[in-house]
């Protein structure tokens, strides 16, 4: 009579190595983002003078790379090592951290819907604050130029917002050649032109409004962003729902792996 062998609880190799493989990619992406951010700061001399971090009056886009890279690095490290070494502490940390991010995203989405007007005012303030610092940082300048070109807009609510910048304002004390003008990214594009005319915005705001509409974008970036959001609401909502489902899936997998590991240890 052959004896029956009892097969105890096992750790799922599929779940273990799926979490490991996914987080290895996440980890390396985090390192890449951090590397880009630190390289950008080194190029701007920030690493040799840390106090200069607070000198910029506007938003430094490098912070996006550093914050996103830091979060991805921490998550990737915890998920990767936790799965490979079957470390329940790191796996639980991974689940909790991912859960906190999910909760913050959900809270931000609800607050953005409830306080739409307040968000709009803050966006207006944010853009105008960065308009003031347009020439202070090359990364900020490139971000503003990209935004205005992509959404075909100028300023927060119109081209006159550029009066806030010391180089573009129309005051008599402004001796800049850019006086009463706008950046080239506000200019309407001629498809036949291959070379960008960086002086196309000179004196643009001295012209009558009818003539301004021919040479520059007169709509503000806040209303243009609102329009873009309404036109692409299904896509944007789909992306956010997809990210949320991935986060929930990651939490469930990590918790499943923790349960397997604890069950195996309990059977020893």
Curated annotation (Swiss-Prot):
UniProt modification remark: Palmitoylated.
Glycan-carrying positions: 49, 169, 174, 232
GO annotation, biological process: positive regulation of Notch signaling pathway; protein localization to plasma membrane; protein maturation; regulation of membrane protein ectodomain proteolysis
Residue intervals on the Extracellular side: 39-61, 114-232
GO cellular component, one term: endoplasmic reticulum lumen
Annotated S-S bridges: 153-221, 154-186, 170-180, 187-200
Highest taxon listed in the record's lineage: Eukaryota
Keyword list, A-Z: Cell membrane, Disulfide bond, Glycoprotein, Membrane, Transmembrane, Transmembrane helix
One Pfam match: Tetraspanin
Molecular function GO labels: enzyme binding
SUPFAM superfamilies according to UniProt: Tetraspanin
Protein name: Tetraspanin-5
Subcellular compartments: Cell membrane
Transmembrane feature ranges: 18-38, 62-82, 93-113, 233-253
Recorded topology in the membrane: Multi-pass membrane protein
Free-text function comment from the UniProt entry: Part of TspanC8 subgroup, composed of 6 members that interact with the transmembrane metalloprotease ADAM10. This interaction is required for ADAM10 exit from the endoplasmic reticulum and for enzymatic maturation and trafficking to the cell surface as well as substrate specificity. Different TspanC8/ADAM10 complexes have distinct substrates. Promotes ADAM10-mediated cleavage of CD44. Seems to regulate VE-cadherin expression in endothelial cells probably through interaction with ADAM10, promoting leukocyte transmigration.
Oligomeric and partner information: Interacts with ADAM10; the interaction influences ADAM10 substrate specificity, endocytosis and turnover.
Higher taxonomy: Eukaryota, Metazoa, Chordata, Craniata, Vertebrata
Signal peptide: none
UniProt keyword rRNA processing present: no
């Amino acid at each position: 009579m052959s004896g029956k062998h009892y097969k105890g609880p096992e750790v799922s190799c599929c779940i273990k190595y799926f979490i490991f493989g996914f987080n290895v990619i996440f980890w390396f992406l985090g390192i890449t983002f951090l590397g880009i951010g630190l390289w950008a700061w080194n190029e701007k001399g920030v690493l040799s003078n840390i106090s200069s971090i607070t000198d910029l009056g506007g938003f430094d886009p490098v912070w996006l790379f550093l914050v996103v890279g830091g979060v991805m690095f921490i998550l990737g490290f915890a998920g990767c090592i936790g799965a490979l070494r079957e470390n329940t502490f790191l796996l639980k940390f991974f689940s909790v951290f991912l859960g906190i991010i999910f909760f913050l995203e959900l809270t931000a989405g609800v607050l953005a819907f409830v306080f739409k007007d307040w968000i709009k005012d803050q966006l207006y303030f944010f853009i105008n604050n960065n308009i003031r610092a347009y020439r202070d940082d090359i990364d900020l300048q490139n971000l503003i130029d990209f935004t205005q070109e992509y959404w075909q807009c100028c300023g927060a609510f119109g081209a006159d917002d550029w009066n806030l910048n010391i180089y573009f304002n129309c005051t008599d004390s402004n001796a800049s050649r850019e006086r009463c003008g706008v950046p080239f990214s506000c200019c309407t594009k001629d498809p036949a032109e291959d070379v960008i005319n960086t002086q196309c915005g000179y004196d643009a705001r001295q012209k009558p409004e009818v003539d301004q509409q021919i040479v520059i974008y007169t709509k503000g970036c806040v209303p243009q962003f609102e329009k873009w959001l309404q036109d692409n609401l299904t896509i944007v909502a789909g992306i956010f729902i997809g990210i949320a489902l991935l986060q929930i899936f990651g939490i469930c997998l990590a918790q499943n792996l923790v349960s397997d590991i604890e069950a195996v240890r309990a059977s020893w």
